[in-house]
């Protein structure tokens, strides 16, 4: 397995990190345990210091529909920023897949949180084309979501192969 510390980041501009932000929340959408965020912070900080654009990819809960507001990261973004101690650019998956990278200022590294990956049918179906539509926009994919790695889902299975 390759280590991030051994990579040459000179030609790496866009990095996707599969994180596990499936955090427990209370009835008021307050995060009750930040352990999963804390575990990802070191890797995110390391790549952030390499001046790359970072795209955080995660699931949250088990939504039964394509979009369910109660499983949207939009309700948690402020808490994520407080815990992780950096600003996040929240973008929906539709925007990312269509033009997300084109809309970002690549001269100024950005950390973006993509909407809940489980809103998209291709995730659960482990769809290769869905995976490629994301990884084709990336120079590097990092799986930091070891707790989700047993899933046969696109973001932990197919993306690692692309």
Report residues per predicted region:
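Active-site loop-to-helix "anion-binding N-cap" substructures in soluble metabolic enzymes
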Residues: 1-162
